């Protein structure tokens, strides 16, 4: 249906990225080509309205995407992409498929993490209405515009309390479309997530950031630790492999940055039947301290201790976004600490 938007061009190398070529981000204010916001001082404005309830919303999005692609083929980098770490020069296949998707049209959350940007205006963000996107996603699916192996990530707010969450997940599962990656507080149990896990096409990530009630309540500012642990155990029981349910620990200096706190967390993961742990660094702390090699070294030393403790229990450590950035930017320190 949309093939006319993707006329074949000579397969020369040019600078672009997976998101620009084949990505879509359903954000809180519109549809974007990508979900990166840290690479440019230019605000990423939507290319189409999420309120449209007809195929022209999708048509307009692909028209805009093709314009950006043609611009990059001519060697003109979009100003909003300058400095982005995802850019690379290669031959990009002309195809009318979405291979990366981010879904985060909501800002509501059932926790109030001390590090989250929404915590400063909780009433405002929790009272914002969800932007409906189910109709648009159905249009994508019906027109075969989503690759079967598309990476579909749910983020922003708490996905499980989105009005359309269950229907959206069931849409993907019923049509055998995409590999889902759902980031959640773990407070609410979802039958749709259960179905997605059972299908083998979903990774479910919960970020308790703690291994006991007191620390959990301090970080999340809600008393729900026992409920979260109970839900994690239920999800872990049905995961097809040991990698589908994952726990995340965001290191928050002066709050949970001790080996004792991490050990408690790792022990809880083991008790729940979880064998993959994502380790990350609190974003705003890292932005402020990224040039302080002494502080960064301490983070790496803590990660090394945690890694050994996990390995003894059959758990695999997976670096997450900010930790990855830190280990790349401070590769010499990281290698020195982790390899010795």
Stretches with model-predicted labels:
Residues 149-153, 178-181, 202-208, 226-330, ...:
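Conserved C-terminal portion of the radical SAM core fold
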């Amino acid at each position: 249906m949309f093939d006319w938007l993707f006329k074949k061009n000579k397969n020369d190398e040019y600078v672009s990225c997976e998101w620009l070529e084949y990505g879509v981000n359903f954000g809180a204010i519109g549809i974007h080509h990508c979900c990166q916001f840290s690479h440019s001082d230019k605000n990423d404005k939507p290319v189409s309205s999420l309120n449209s309830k007809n195929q022209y919303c999708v048509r307009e999005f692909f028209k805009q995407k093709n314009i950006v692609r043609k611009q990059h083929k001519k060697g003109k980098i979009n100003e909003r992409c300058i400095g982005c770490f995802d850019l690379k020069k290669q031959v990009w296949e002309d195809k009318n498929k979405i291979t990366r998707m981010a879904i985060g049209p909501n800002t509501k959350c059932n926790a109030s993490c001390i590090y989250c940007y929404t915590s400063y205006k909780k009433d405002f963000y929790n009272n914002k209405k969800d932007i409906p996107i189910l109709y648009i996603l159905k249009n994508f699916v019906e027109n075969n515009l989503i690759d079967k192996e598309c990476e579909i990530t749910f983020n922003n707010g708490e996905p499980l309390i989105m009005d359309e969450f269950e229907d959206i997940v069931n849409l993907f599962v019923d049509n055998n479309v995409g590999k889902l990656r759902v980031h959640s507080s773990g407070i609410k149990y979802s039958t749709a997530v259960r179905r997605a896990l059972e299908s083998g096409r979903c990774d479910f990530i919960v970020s308790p950031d703690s291994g006991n009630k007191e620390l959990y309540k301090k970080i999340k500012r809600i008393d729900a630790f026992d409920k979260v642990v109970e839900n994690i155990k239920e999800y872990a029981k049905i995961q097809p492999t040991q990698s589908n349910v994952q726990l995340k620990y965001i290191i928050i200096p002066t709050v949970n940055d001790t080996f004792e706190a991490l050990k408690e967390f790792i022990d809880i993961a083991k008790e729940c039947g979880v064998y993959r742990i994502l380790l990350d660094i609190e974003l705003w702390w890292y932005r402020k301290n990224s040039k302080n090699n002494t502080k960064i070294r301490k983070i790496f030393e803590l990660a090394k201790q945690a890694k050994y403790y996990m390995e003894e229990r059959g758990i695999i450590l997976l670096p997450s976004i900010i930790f990855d950035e830190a280990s790349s930017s401070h590769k010499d320190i990281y290698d020195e600490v982790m390899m010795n």
